[in-house]
Each structure stands twice: as C-alpha cells, then as structure tokens.
Amino acid sequence: MTSYNFEVTTITSLSKNKPQQAIVLCHGYGGDGRDISVLANNWQRFLPECIFLCPNAPEICAVNPQGYQWFDLTLDKEEVILEKSLIAEEKLNIFLDQVLDNFQLDPSNLALVGFSQGCMISIQIALKKKKQINC
C-alpha cells in the first residue's frame, strides 16, 4: 500500500509492468480527485504505461464543503491568498516527490496538469521546479 500526504484517486496503468510515466491531475476549486479522474479514464487507452493520480486538495472548500480547495479564494487580502498558495505548493511538492519515489520515476516522466484552480497551482509549481517536470 502506497502512502501519500493527500487522499488520492488512482487510475492504475493498463500495462502489467511498473508504470513508466505518472500524470498528476489537480482538480478545480470545489472539486475533488474523483471529479478529475474521469479525464484519466479517457486518456488511459493512449498512455497504457502511465499511472494517473488525482489528489484531493488539502483544504475543505470555503463555498462547497463537499469539495476541496488548494487555497482559499474568498479572502479579500491578496497577500493572504499568496501565502496560502505557497503552503499548498509546498504540500503538493511533497506529494510529487512521493510519487517519483514510489514509482522510481525520473522527473521528466511526471506530468502535472490541472483544471481551474488546479491549473493555477500546477503552473505555480512547474515554473519553480529545479528538475523539470511536464506541465
């Protein structure tokens, strides 16, 4: 059993071999990993050696308590939103390192994608990565 710092919906690779790539899909504001995993179900046939991981964001959503948020967008102060996004970035970076370690992948075989707020956090992370990942 693989352990992560997030609750994760996982779509395993179609291949019986160890995954050669991993795609992390980050959901939008108020969503969850199950929502965005539908994309993985569609992409899987084109990427049979790939595992798809869809983490729930770290916070319960301020406007939808059934969903999650990477950081709170309802706050009025930009500096607080930035601070919260940096905390989410740190947590997601830990998760990405866990994925790379668990599947023994080179960062070039990891793609980070997202929808809405998930795209925001994905770009924020990918632009700062020392070892390049795909975004």
Map each language-model feature to its residues.
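Serine-hydrolase catalytic machinery in alpha/beta-hydrolase-like enzymes
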Residues: 2-105, 109
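Primarily recognizes the serine-hydrolase "nucleophile elbow" in alpha/beta-hydrolase
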Residues: 108-135
